[in-house]
């Protein structure tokens, strides 16, 4: 059964049309370069879990570049499943699985499709932490601590402060606008994320500065 048919059987009201976000189009190249430089591109049957896949664009442009890695998209908003499936269906390497629902604030054992502990080589999360409550960041690192294999890596992308300093002014303005929209949102400080990492058996391994004042962070599972 095709991916689309399988997902349609589970979610009969899905609309299988690609959604496109300009920001994902813009950051696809730099994210690809940062991720490809840090993953194993030869070992077969590696597994990557993406948290908050959104439209599915990231998996859509990354998976064909890494045919040895199987991508598992997840998303809280079920109305995104059709778009994710559309990107997966067009993937020439056929290494994107059907998405499943994840509330990242919940323990992985309570997810709709609970993964086995230490079952993933990689995790990836883009542009979630600043537009979600702090409880989502807590849950993200908890999931990484439980689901990554020893020596596995979680990659996170987005705007971040460092040791209480947020630059440039455009990021300061962006943070202010986020908090005005929702007091629980806001650009996260890497020093606070390091605390979450340590609590879950991870450490910051690498920081790559990206275009548009974003950063690509690599978290190593110890």
UniProtKB/Swiss-Prot annotation:
Which positions form S-S bridges?
Answer: none
- Which Gene Ontology terms cover its molecular function? methyltransferase activity
Q: Which SUPFAM superfamilies match?
A: S-adenosyl-L-methionine-dependent methyltransferases (SSF53335)
Going by the entry's taxonomy, the superkingdom of the source organism is recorded as Eukaryota
Its family remark reads:
Belongs to the UPF0585 family.
What protein name is recorded for this chain? UPF0585 protein CG18661
Q: Which organism is it from?
A: Drosophila melanogaster (Fruit fly)
